Amino acid sequence: MQVLHLCLAVSIAVALLSQAAWSEEVFDDTDVGDELTNALESVLTDFKDKREAEEPSAFMTRLRRQVAQMHVWRAVNHDRNHGTGSGRHGRFLIRNRYRYGGGHLSDA
């Protein structure tokens, strides 16, 4: 959503700049250039601050989920009656057992 806002702000700024260039307005006589520059700088800094604040938590959430899934599948694959995953066909035995109704695992 933030990327959409950033793209929208940049496209509006480019449209205004191109309109001003085609109508040959000079930015020195008006405050349009300064206003556009300030608006773009504020949008970019706001986007950068939010992205840096949100990405580490999202990354850690994804990493925790992957680690949890790894532990779940390691526990599922550790079975003495069927393949342990170390043999040649062990993973196929486990996969087929869970695919055809032997065990039920919900992948959260």
From Swiss-Prot:
Where in the sequence is Pyrrolidone carboxylic acid (Glu) found? E24, E52
Q: Report the domain of life of the source organism.
A: Eukaryota
Q: In which tissues is it expressed?
A: Neurons R3-R14. A cluster of 12 giant neurons located on the right side of the abdominal ganglion.
Task: Give a GO biological-process term.
Answer: neuropeptide signaling pathway
Please provide, in alphabetical order, the Gene Ontology terms of the cellular component aspect for this entry: extracellular region
Any signal peptide, and if so, which residues? 1-23
Q: Which UniProt keywords apply?
A: Cleavage on pair of basic residues, Neuropeptide, Pyrrolidone carboxylic acid, Secreted, Signal
**Cellular location(s):** Secreted
Keyword Transport attributed: no
> What's the PTM story here?
The partial formation of pyroglutamate from N-terminal glutamic acid in peptides isolated from single cells is detected by mass spectrometry. There are indications this modification depends on a heat sensitive factor.
Q: What does this protein do?
A: HRBP is a myoactive peptide that excites Aplysia heart and enhances gut motility in vitro.
Protein name (Swiss-Prot/TrEMBL): Abdominal ganglion neuropeptide R3-14
Query: Which species is this UniProt entry from?
Result: Aplysia californica
